[in-house]
């Protein structure tokens, strides 16, 4: 689900061309707090943390990993991400444009994951939620501060374990 309040703020910031912070999608966050597995084996999904007003505290229920999806230009201080991750702008003949966000979690990442996909309990890398987050750079130190970035979307899904023997590719499309 789109966090309409935060998304509207980021779009307005990007259109103003006077700000670097909150001016576009920067990273994808992953978490394991979006659902509960009941003793019966049934899965209870939580509501998304989205609203129609700007909320700088909106976040995943339990963010455990993040991956940069933005590709920096030569004139920005944005950290370089994985070359297989990117954001593509797809124009249409209609009154909309799509943003296609690709994110690959490769075999060796994240560090500390289980060797095989056989977990029977919730671990840091059994993901059941993800979100897109805006860019944020501390204006005093110049460092990128992902903890201060605005969450732009929040999706909750069936738990999926990321383990060393598995790649996970996410293709996330936002229509504007």
Question: For the regions a protein language model found, what residue spans apply to each?
Answer:
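Small cysteine-rich, disulfide-bonded extracellular modules of the LU/uPAR three-finger superfamily
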Residues: 1-127, 135-176
């Amino acid at each position: 689900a789109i966090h309409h309040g935060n998304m509207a703020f980021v779009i307005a910031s990007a259109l103003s061309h006077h700000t670097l912070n909150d001016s576009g999608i920067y990273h994808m966050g992953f978490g394991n707090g979006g659902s509960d597995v009941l003793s019966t084996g049934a899965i209870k999904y939580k509501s998304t943390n989205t609203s129609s007003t700007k909320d700088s505290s909106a976040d995943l229920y339990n963010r455990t990993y993040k991956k940069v999806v933005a590709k920096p230009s030569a004139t920005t201080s944005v950290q370089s991400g994985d070359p297989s991750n990117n954001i593509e702008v797809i124009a249409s003949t209609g009154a909309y444009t799509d943003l296609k966000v690709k994110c690959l979690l490769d075999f060796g990442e994240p560090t500390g994951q289980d060797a095989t996909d056989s977990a029977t309990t919730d671990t840091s890398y059994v993901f059941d939620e993800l979100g897109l987050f805006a860019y944020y750079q501390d204006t005093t130190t110049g460092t990128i501060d992902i903890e201060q970035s605005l969450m732009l979307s929040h999706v909750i899904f069936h738990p999926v374990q990321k383990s060393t023997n598995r790649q996970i590719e996410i293709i996330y499309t936002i229509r504007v």
